[in-house]
Amino acid sequence: MEKKNRLILALDVTDRENALRIANEVSDYVDSIKVGYPLVLGEGLSIVKELVEIAPVIADFKVADIPNTDRLICEHVFNAGAAGIITHGFTGRDSLDSCVKVANEFGTDVYVVTEMSHPGGVEFFRPVAEDIASMAVEAGASGVVAPATRPERVKDIRKIIGEELSIISPGVGAQGGSAADVIRAGADWVIVGRSIYNSDSPAEAAKKICDEMNC
């Protein structure tokens, strides 16, 4: 993913018309659009094929299954045109290897969750986040997901992965994270959803976040 604006839109709306409208409005300010279950369950994977005409798409399915099932999920996502997928790492190295193998075949990216951004994200992830980050490096993943709500954790993860992997960081805006703070902590991109798509002017909201990061 080309680092231009350092902003990823989390497009967690549920209908096609709204999704395409917002995506088009913010296209000048985002490097990628992240879609998850709310939109894909509502509109099907075909929405990915439409969104990739606007910006690269990351499928946030937090893939977490046995290797064969993970492989099938990744193949469907990448065949739909997604440029990347988000997976969990707690299912182990063989499951992650399966995702990375498919991504390598398609020339796409895998981002591994190290620690989630909501308060409950520390309950079980905190003790294993560093191990997951190390595994992501060893498996050849493209990057990791680390919380903008806890910039100190982004610093910790960056120390482990070095400059080999990218960090994409959710939790800016509605969850309380600061885009500028987490970029300073070592994130490559921030992921922002509600603060943009619930705004009266998504483009202005996206521009404001970009300005905060001086991008």
From Swiss-Prot:
Pathway: Pyrimidine metabolism; UMP biosynthesis via de novo pathway; UMP from orotate: step 2/2
EC number in record: 4.1.1.23
Annotated binding of substrate, by residue: 12, 34, 60-69, 117, 170-180, 193-194
Pfam families: OMPdecase (PF00215)
PANTHER family: OROTIDINE 5'-PHOSPHATE DECARBOXYLASE
Family of the protein in this entry: Belongs to the OMP decarboxylase family. Type 1 subfamily.
Protein name as catalogued: Orotidine 5'-phosphate decarboxylase
Organism of origin: Methanococcoides burtonii (strain DSM 6242 / NBRC 107633 / OCM 468 / ACE-M)
Gene designation per UniProt: pyrF
